[in-house]
Swiss-Prot record:
It catalyses: hydrogencarbonate + L-glutamine + 2 ATP + H2O = carbamoyl phosphate + L-glutamate + 2 ADP + phosphate + 2 H(+). The keyword Plastid does not apply. This is Carbamoyl phosphate synthase small chain. Residues 210-398 form the Glutamine amidotransferase type-1 domain. Pathway: Amino-acid biosynthesis; L-arginine biosynthesis; carbamoyl phosphate from bicarbonate: step 1/1; Pyrimidine metabolism; UMP biosynthesis via de novo pathway; (S)-dihydroorotate from bicarbonate: step 1/3. Small subunit of the glutamine-dependent carbamoyl phosphate synthetase (CPSase). CPSase catalyzes the formation of carbamoyl phosphate from the ammonia moiety of glutamine, carbonate, and phosphate donated by ATP, constituting the first step of 2 biosynthetic pathways, one leading to arginine and/or urea and the other to pyrimidine nucleotides. The small subunit (glutamine amidotransferase) binds and cleaves glutamine to supply the large subunit with the substrate ammonia. SMART domains: CPSase_sm_chain. Keywords: Amino-acid biosynthesis, Arginine biosynthesis, ATP-binding, Glutamine amidotransferase, Ligase, Nucleotide-binding, Pyrimidine biosynthesis. PROSITE patterns: GATASE_TYPE_1 (PS51273). Its EC number is 6.3.5.5. Composed of two chains; the small (or glutamine) chain promotes the hydrolysis of glutamine to ammonia, which is used by the large (or ammonia) chain to synthesize carbamoyl phosphate. Tetramer of heterodimers (alpha,beta)4. InterPro entries: Anth_synth/Amidotransfase, CarbamoylP_synth_ssu, CarbamoylP_synth_ssu_N, CarbP_synth_ssu_N_sf, Class_I_gatase-like, CPSase_GATase1, GATASE. It comes from Bartonella henselae (strain ATCC 49882 / DSM 28221 / CCUG 30454 / Houston 1) (Rochalimaea henselae). SUPFAM superfamilies: Carbamoyl phosphate synthetase, small subunit N-terminal domain, Class I glutamine amidotransferase-like. The lineage of its organism: Bacteria, Pseudomonadati, Pseudomonadota, Alphaproteobacteria, Hyphomicrobiales.
Length: 399
């Protein structure tokens, strides 16, 4: 069914300057902000009330448009410290953003640029002034939607062409997006977490551990929390082979988050991960890294109905018996029924009982679906980094 949804009356305008055109033919009108042009992508909703800059720069959102359920986005502006993609000039992250209210002038002591100008520099197209919660309900009922977001300050759109492009885009399934966002060469990292009124600290102390981080679309705050454990980090591209990694003599290996279909990335990632498992080097994965680890042990991943995106998701850790509130950002999940006997499920989502963690019995190997580094979000799961380093210390004693 084709329909056009005008912007609600409080934000109504004479001529829309931005559109969201869904693959089913629905056209949603509003005001444009940020970059001009158009972009095809999957539309998801995020329920976080803060951290829009971190969300929009997370490489895991590659080829996605983020619909924010919180109405006021942009109030605190933007700054150079809250960006999450490894190389900001590459602008890896969301291609579009949807807000209920217009972007206002920022009010925050850390702000050095307003959101509208920042979106232009990041080449992110924004749609403002629509009923974002109605769109959220649509996604919840119909599942993740494919569509196209378009912005023209003059309001000139060829809607038929936009509809055809939206219908032609096939979605995230079978897309290996890690190759598009990964670093192109190895690099070092020594920045530690942010300190109030002091910014980010550099790890100049003598390092006790060497961690190799495989970059499938890694977030900066993950690296900072690893560096906080007296570790120096070597970041390597997603397709780095096992011989190159072992030659670096790591004390532990980290499998990062990232975008796209894990089954597509698995073609080159799984053989390396399987060899790492056999090496008995401690291994820790987050998000896409978790899914790739599951594929490496013979499990399967599946596309979710709507995915999990937000900073308020309850997860249970079966090891501690505790419930944690965590940040999540994924559209694929591990099929629990496909886990082999030597792999134990360690975490589940209390929203839908989907898998959120696993470990290999008898191996120093584990992973989680959620984001313990948060950024944005709660810090309930920070202990997982210590769990990783506990395994590393045990490994070094016997190595």
């Amino acid at each position: 069914m084709t329909q056009t949804i005008p912007s609600p009356k409080p934000w109504s305008i004479n001529k829309p300057t931005a559109l969201l055109v869904l693959a089913n033919g629905t056209v949603i009108e509003g005001k444009g902000a940020g970059a001009t042009g158009f972009a095809e992508a999957e539309i998801c909703f995020n329920t976080a009330m803060t951290g829009y800059e971190e969300i929009l720069t997370d490489p895991s959102y590659k080829k996605q448009i983020v619909n924010f359920t919180f109405p006021h986005i942009g109030n605190v502006g933007t700054n150079s410290e809250d960006i999450e993609d490894l190389i900001p000039l590459n602008c890896h992250g969301a291609v579009g953003a949807i807000f209920k209210a217009d972007i206002t002038h920022p009010s925050n002591y850390r702000a050095n640029e307003n959101l509208n100008q920042w979106l232009k520099k990041r080449k992110i197209i924004a749609l403002c002034g629509i009923d974002t919660r109605a769109l959220t309900v649509l996604i919840r009922e119909k599942g993740a939607l494919n569509g196209i977001i378009a912005h023209d300050p003059n309001g000139n759109f060829d809607i038929n062409t936009l509809k055809k492009r939206a219908q032609k885009w096939t979605g995230l399934v079978n897309l290996d997006l890690a190759q598009e966002v990964t670093s192109k060469q190895s690099m070092k990292w020594n920045e530690k977490p942010w300190v109030w009124n002091k910014g980010y600290k550099t790890n100049n102390d003598a390092s006790n551990f060497h961690i190799v981080a495989i970059d499938y679309g890694i977030k900066r705050n993950i690296l900072r929390l690893i560096a906080a454990h007296s570790a120096h980090i070597t970041i390597v591209p997603a397709n780095t082979n096992i011989e190159e990694i072992l030659a670096m003599n790591p004390d532990g290996v980290f499998l990062s988050n990232g975008p796209g279909d894990p089954a597509a990335t698995a073609n080159y990632a799984v053989p390396t991960i399987q060899a790492l498992i056999d090496s008995n080097i401690p291994l820790f994965g987050i998000c896409l890294g978790h899914q790739l680890l599951a594929l490496a042990v013979g499990a399967k991943t599946i596309k979710m109905h709507q995915g999990h995106h937000g900073a308020n998701h309850p997860v249970k850790d079966f090891i501690t018996g505790k419930v944690e509130i965590v940040s999540m950002n994924h559209g694929f999940t591990v099929d629990t029924t496909s886990l082999p006997q030597h792999v134990e499920e360690t975490h589940i989502s209390l929203f839908d009982n989907s898998n959120c963690g696993l470990r290999i019995i008898g191996k120093p190997v584990f992973s989680v679906q959620h984001h313990p580094e948060a950024s944005p979000g709660p810090q309930d799961s920070h202990y997982l980094f210590q769990r990783f380093f506990n395994l590393i210390m045990d490994y070094k004693k016997t190595a």
